[in-house]
Amino acid sequence: MAVPKRKMSRSNTRHRRSQWKAAVPTLVSCERCQEPKLQHIACPSCGTYNKRQVLEV
């Protein structure tokens, strides 16, 4: 197994880890109630998905 030959500096460690972050979820507005919702998921406020009522709210 590979072993580091030298200690990695705090700056280099943080610089490498700066790219390792969570992506912000994309929000779209609901076609029926105009509330923000996640893509490809039923609207939590009105219960519609793809112009159909799928949840009882």
UniProtKB/Swiss-Prot annotation:
Classification via HAMAP family: Ribosomal_bL32 (MF_00340)
TM stretches of this protein: none
GO cellular component, one term: large ribosomal subunit
Family from the record: Belongs to the bacterial ribosomal protein bL32 family.
Residue runs in coiled coils: none
Protein name, entry field: Large ribosomal subunit protein bL32
Record-level GO BP terms: translation
